[in-house]
Regions:
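Short, small/polar-rich motifs associated with maturation and membrane association
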Residues: 1-299, 313
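Short, solvent-exposed loop/turn motifs
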Residues: 17-20, 126, 353-355, 441, ...
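Extracellular/periplasmic, surface-exposed regions of secreted and cell-surface proteins
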Residues: 68, 116-117, 252, 302-311, ...
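Generic recognition of well-structured, leucine-rich alpha-helical segments
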Residues: 87, 184, 296, 322, ...
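Detector for glycine-centered tight turns/loop "hinges" at secondary-structure junctions
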Residues: 124, 351-353, 359, 439, ...
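Acidic, glycine-rich flexible loop segments
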Residues: 213-239, 253, 334-368
Length: 673
């Protein structure tokens, strides 16, 4: 029972319409939820605006908050897997704080994988959404064909992802609290050979190479020790995956949000927290955490204010604070895990790092073993702080002509990060039989051979040193102004958009070439839409913009696209029925471009050279400058090396895209194709 007779019970379920029922001190309530059949009158976010879903002629896929929250991954990119047709994601790492997936729209459509990334806009501004809290996302729309992306010109060839954040709605304040606890585990761990098997295969390989039995890296005595496992310090057998890694790692994610407002003021505020732990075990003898971890704080505040009956001001602020922790010297830890030999070290023994002598088994390379690069080297802590600000002012101009409006938008983003390093060093203990190093010259098979263990100590336990590593500062701004027109004349609906935008990024490619030269874009956008009774639909889009990567006379281009649609079920000869609810055929064709050359910029600049540059062989082996000419002359000569050849004719990639599609709803919109 509920003592307050004015209490309201809110019932909701994914896929059904929510209901609010007054309790009135009743002991039992029966609630029947209606299926949430999406109306064709609903609007969908498109480039620089919204359109009714019924009149869309472009290829657009969408996913909402509920679907994203079904798989609460640390990175939103991993939640998109399997959610959107035509969108593929590839996750190359599970490292906490660095597990973002690469996203491709309709495959890799560029010369390089790096150049095939789609353009990502959050609330209409180019930003990363990888570390956003899914609780603050209203929808993610993916624009796939030329009709939907032509307005982005030189940046639309690989598709566009539009992320829209949540905003407040008129009504009482609603407080939402969510908490998720989960585990992460590797999809598959390699099966590795034990010491005896590894040594046996190595002996077999040496015999195949013609090595005599008395010259084999592993003697019969060595093989017997591996087989019996009776000398685990000198002849260890370690599965490094099992030794260093846990089966699973814990991830927690929490969020609290509040939204509501009045007719004139609406608000949405969200606070999120995420902690992602790594898979590695804490090793003995260390006074710091040797595991990977990532802590993230998300915050967002969106405010909509009706200044007058015709003027609306929208303000948005968001931020992400991240703290990523990585063991020092562990950049290639997964490669080292795979390469590390089971007999390279017994691991940490009584709080001491013990490693096998590198020459114990002649011819066996034991460099780059994981215990050497992972234990005792300290850690790196990367702190990042990202903030975004948006301001949008829209003015209804119905007093001039019905359906006319103007909109002005400005945005500012700032990103700052730095790395703090904590470095240390620990003693290394190398085990020997006593008679191996006492100068007796005895063979291990001799009865007087002393097999008691002694250790040779190298290095020293050093106090931790602290330093600051790489710093990154970036900022950018974006401005946009548009005139919009939407009006209905009887059964005819017309719409138009004329938009100007400009942006500039400072320190965009740090630390790559030309990182200190800002990146700038400027462009014009046009759109015309028409439909008759939502049955016959036509749309024309055009983008005129350019890229500073190319020569001035090849910097700007025009990118047009057109599309048509025909809703067959609106015809009178198809009676209304529950089997085929909606059927639309659509087609589009358009020209789009791609100027994403990864880290390469200003490809039109004259040829460049470097003087007295080191050849990589000299760098690797002798650290000498210049080059050697001839076989007998060993003196390094000053020389010039080509760096980049300029090409004033190079321009963006272009793609002429065609798209044909059918939208069909069956069984009262329960099945959608």
């Amino acid at each position: 029972t509920v003592p307050d007779g004015n209490s309201i019970l809110s019932v909701s379920f994914i896929g059904y319409q929510s209901q609010e029922i007054k309790v009135n001190s009743r002991r039992g309530i029966n609630v029947r939820l209606q299926e949430n059949v999406q109306s064709l009158d609903e609007v969908m976010v498109v480039a620089y605006g919204v359109q009714k879903k019924a009149t869309l002629t472009g290829a657009i896929s969408s996913v909402g908050t509920e679907a994203l929250l079904k798989s609460p991954s640390a990175s939103v990119t991993n939640s998109l897997a399997g959610q959107l047709p035509g969108v593929s994601s590839m996750q190359a790492s599970g490292q906490p704080g660095a597990d973002n997936a690469k996203i491709f729209v309709r495959g890799v459509g560029s010369l390089t994988e790096g150049g095939a990334a789609p353009l990502i806009l959050v609330d209409g501004v180019e930003r990363s959404f990888y570390q956003m809290d899914p609780n603050e996302i209203e929808s993610i729309n993916v624009l796939k064909d030329a009709s939907a992306t032509a307005v982005f010109g030189v940046r639309g060839a690989n598709g566009v992802i539009l992320v829209t954040t949540r905003r407040g709605e008129e009504g009482k304040a609603k407080i939402s609290i969510s908490s998720n606890v989960g585990i992460q585990m590797p999809t598959r761990i390699l099966d590795v050979a034990d010491s005896y098997t590894t040594a046996s295969l190595f002996r077999e390989a040496q015999r195949n190479d013609g090595v005599a039995d008395d010259q084999l890296a592993f003697s019969e005595y060595d093989m017997e020790r591996f087989r019996l496992g009776d000398s685990p310090i000198l002849y260890p057998n370690v599965n490094w995956y099992d030794y260093l890694m846990n089966k699973a790692a814990v991830q927690t994610q929490h969020n609290v949000s509040i939204s509501g407002g009045t007719k004139d003021i609406r608000y949405f505020v969200s606070l999120g927290f995420l902690f992602q732990n790594g898979l590695f075990k804490q090793l003995d003898g260390l006074d710091y955490d040797n595991n990977y971890s990532y802590t993230r704080y998300n915050y967002r505040a969106n405010l909509d204010v009706n200044l007058t009956r015709t003027t609306t001001l929208k303000f948005g602020m968001g931020g992400i604070v991240g703290n990523q922790r990585d063991p020092g010297g562990s950049g290639n830890v997964w490669k080292q895990l795979t390469w590390s030999l089971p007999f390279s070290s017994p691991g940490i023994v009584d709080g001491k790092k013990v490693v096998t002598q590198s020459t114990r088994f002649p011819g066996v390379k034991m460099e780059n073993q994981v215990i050497n690069g992972f234990y005792g080297y300290g850690y790196d802590r990367k702190v990042s702080n990202n903030m975004t600000f948006d301001l949008n002012l829209s003015q209804n101009l119905d007093f001039i002509t019905k359906g006319l409006s103007i909109e002005v938008k400005g945005a500012y983003n700032t990103d700052y990060s730095y790395i703090k390093t904590v470095r240390g060093h620990v003693e290394t203990y190398t085990p020997f039989y006593k008679s191996e190093i006492d100068g007796s010259g005895l063979d291990v098979e001799d009865l007087d051979f002393d097999k008691s263990l002694v250790y040779r100590i190298t290095g020293e336990n050093m106090m931790k040193t602290y330093g600051t590593g790489d710093k990154k500062r970036a900022r950018d701004w974006y401005v946009e102004g548009s005139i919009r027109y939407n009006r209905k004349f009887g059964e005819h609906n017309v719409g138009a958009l004329l938009l100007y935008n400009q942006s500039k990024k400072y320190y965009p490619n740090y630390p790559n070439k030309f990182w200190d030269v800002p990146t700038a874009y400027v462009g014009l956008v046009g759109r015309l839409t028409y439909d008759y009774k939502s049955k016959y639909i036509a749309e024309f889009n055009i983008g005129y913009n350019g890229s500073e990567n190319f020569a001035p006379d090849k910097r700007f281009g025009t990118f047009p696209a057109g599309s048509i649609g025909y809703v067959i079920t609106e015809e009178k000869f198809i009676p209304k029925n529950d089997f085929l609810t909606y059927l639309k055929v659509r087609a589009s064709v358009g020209l789009v471009g791609n100027d994403n050359m990864s880290s390469n910029r200003f490809l039109y600049l004259p040829d460049s050279y470097s003087i007295n540059n080191s050849d990589w062989l000299q760098q690797a082996y002798q650290d000498k400058n210049g080059y050697i000419f001839g076989l007998t002359n060993t003196a390094y000569q000053v020389a010039a090396k080509e760096l980049m050849l300029g090409n004033s004719n190079v321009t963006w990639e272009t793609a002429l895209k065609q798209n044909y599609g059918i939208d069909a709803y069956f069984f009262s919109d329960r099945l959608k194709l």
